[in-house]
Every structure is written in C-alpha cells, then in structure tokens.
Amino acid sequence: MIGTAKLLGAAAAAALMAVSATPAHAQDATDELLLRLKEKGILTDDEYNALVARKQTQPAPQAAVPNQTAGATTVPGNNSAEGPQQAAAERLDDKKLVRMMDAGVGFQIGDVGVKFSGSVNGYYVNDNGDKALPRNAVAGGLASVGDNSSSIRNGLLPGFLKVDVTTNQGGWDVGAHFGLYPGINSGVGNSGANGAGLPQALQTSGIDARQTYLTFGKPNFGEVKIGRDIGLFASDAILNDITLLAVGTAAGNAAPSNTSLGRIGLGYIYTDFQPQITYSSPKFGGLQFAVGIFQPLTTIGRNEVNGSPGFQGKVTYDLVPTDGGFGAHAWVSGLVQKHDGIDGLPSYTGRAIDLGAKLSYANFGLTGYYYTGTGVGTIGLFLLSTDAAGRKRDSDGFYVQGTAGFGKFTLGASYGRSTLDRTDNEPVSELVKSNSSYVGQARYGLTSWVTLIGEYTYTRSRAHNGNDANSDALAAGAILFF
C-alpha cells in the first residue's frame, strides 16, 4: 500500500510537471487526477493543497496571438488556471473523504468522527490471609481468609474498548458512546461479568457492557447525557485512586472475576455505572456542576419497588498548572434516594455526601477524600444499608494518598478506611465495623502506552464483636492504554 501510494504520488507530481509542457486543456485532467488521489486518501489535505498551490504558481502554456495594431505577436495574461481549479474544488465532495484524526485512534468520515480508546491489563497476584477460624469471621469483611492463593488476573480495571461516534448537527455537538469491559478470567455460567470466577478449563470470561449513552450539547449550553455511564456521587474518589491502575485489595483471589477491589469499601463506596439522565454545565473559569436523575437501586437483599428516582449531583473545580507549577482538582458530590417499604419493613431515604481534593506540584501529588452517609451502606450502594428491622445504618470513610515522580518512575502510597455503624438497637455481631488498607505502589512508564506496576497491599477487617482478619497481597504486571 505504501509503495502504491508513492507510485501514485509520483504520477501526480509527473502530471503536475507536464502541465507546463502541454496545452491548456490538459489542466482539467491534472485537476481531476489530484482530486481523485485526494478522495481515495492517497494524498492528504496538506499534500493536495501543496500540489495545487505549486500548480497555480507555474505559468500556464500560452498561445501567441496577433497584435492587431502593430502586426506583431503578444502573449495574453495568465488567468486560465483559475477556472479549472475552481471547478475541481466545486466538484470535491468533502463528505466522501476519510481522514486520520488529529489525536487518538480513529478517523473522520466527512463531518462524523469515530474514535477508539481502550485498555488491557494483567497481574500476577499472591494473596496471603489469616486462617479460616471463628475469630477471623467478619460479615462484610474484605480481608482474605483461608489458604494462600495465586492468580493471573485483572486489576481494579478490567480491559475495555470504548467507541465514540460524534458530529455536529444544526449547531449541536452530538455523540453516541459505547463501552465494553471484558476480563481475562473465567466466570460462572450466566452470573455476569462481576459474578464469581471459575478457574477451570473450558470456561470463558465475561463482558461487562458498562457504557451505552448519548450526548448532545453546545459550548455555552453544557451537555445532556442519557444512558448508562459512571455515577456522579463518589466517581472522583475512584478516578483519583492509584489502585485504579493496579490491584489493591485482592478479594476472591483464588477464583478471580473481572476485577479486584482496589480501594472500594476501603475508603469509598463504589460509584457504579448506572442508567441516568444528567446535565453538565459549561465551565465557568475552573468551576463546573452536574445534576442528574438515576435509576432507583434496590436495597441489596431486598426487592422493593421504588416509586421515585435517585438524585445525584457534583461540583468540581480545576486549577490547571502552568509550567509545572501548582495545580488542583477539588470536588463535592452527593446522592439522595427514597426506598419504599416491603414485607412489613419501613421505607427509608438514603443520603450521602463526599468531598475531596487532589493537589499537584511538579511531579508530586497529594490526594485527600472523605464521605459520610446514612442508609447508603458500605462497599457498594445500599449494601448493608439497613439492619434486619429496616432501620438505617450510618457509614463514613476516607483515604489519603501521595505520589512522587522521578523520570519514568512513579512511587505512590495510600491509606484508607470505611466504617459501618450499628443501629441503636442492633445486637453486637460479626457485622463488619471497618475495612482498611495500606497500599504501596511503584510504576514505570515503559512506553507511552504501557506501564509496568508492582504493588503491595495490607488489608484489615474488623467486626463489631471484636473479630479481626488480615491479609497481604503482592501484585506485579502491566497495564496498557490507547
């Protein structure tokens, strides 16, 4: 293909040179040739324009005409190239052209852009937890208990392939967005990508279709999103977590599913990917807000029918660093959702709010995060959010994190904890009181796409009755983004 392109490019140049030695009507053929080479993608816009400009600067062949007044011959002015070139430009249908995008992996078809982005990762993980004894039993605990285990698995991120199709119609920027998140580990039957793993032969991995949404907006209007995408509450907590690139707490390591836990339930509640209708404002300086209505989620373990949607909102502020100086990203978000009663249990309303900030200077970063809620549970939204009588439990959590870059190396460390309270009349039990973890991480940027990562995670789970469990995990592998 490259050889063909060079050959045709040479032919175009030869045709161009021939213009000066052929009659004027041959210019039409040259214009047509250049146009066809551009339409087929052999000539880029820049190459086409350069050849056209070069052609226009060359003197056109001119016939001598008699000088009626002096009996001599004269040469007329050079205006003959303008007509054929203008005609060629008018014949060009820009919507038939396929162009390479300025950035990313994708292409432009007329007014429509198609962009692909994605990631693949894999890690060797060795997880060593406490023995499975009664004193180590914690209901809702995330520290591993049982035999030492090894696995080759995904980290907190599964793989993903995202496709964005965008254009402008009638002054509106519109887009269709699809995100597929396949894992490398085998799953159990039809339990879904986030179900239990099954490390046996003749099994297949799952695909998590997390993102399916449309967008439309204008620069001065903002953007409307309709479909399934990441939530607003607690989304910045996970997106700024260093374990997002690696493994973190490796729950279920003996039979891994699509993802590890990272710091989910160990400093923040998982935001989740949810059906929603969300409006995001334009940026006012560095300030932006978003609000949305969401598919109401049921209490995990109950199957109530909820008559009202959930509501979430977020405000962010960005200070972009200049010349490696000080930068900041700060956020506050919240959610409210009413749960209707079922089977004699009362209705309740879950509420939560969080706030966080990531500060950066040169190659150093510091992140702090905190959340508090009632009736929202821990680990995932509305998991363990009420007691057996339907009364709301309170919960909170935090994490702190620091990073330092040295050339292609980045070192990071973090600590976080999530706490779940008993209700006033709830008996003491093995119910989880807190999950916490320490993380140490080292990264090396092998290429612009590939990062090598090594990580150590210590996880501790404590129950309200005093039970306690601990585990250590070592992970080493790589992640690729494009």
List each model region and its residues.
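Residue-level detector of the transmembrane beta-barrel scaffold of outer-membrane proteins
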Residues: 115-117, 173-177, 223-225, 288-290, ...
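Transmembrane beta-strands of outer-membrane beta-barrel pores
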Residues: 122-128, 169, 180-184, 230-232, ...
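Detector for outer-membrane/organellar transmembrane beta-barrel domains
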Residues: 308, 313-440, 444
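Outer membrane beta-barrel
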Residues: 102-132, 144-298, 307-309, 316-319
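Outer-membrane beta-barrel "beta-signal"
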Residues: 284, 313, 470-482
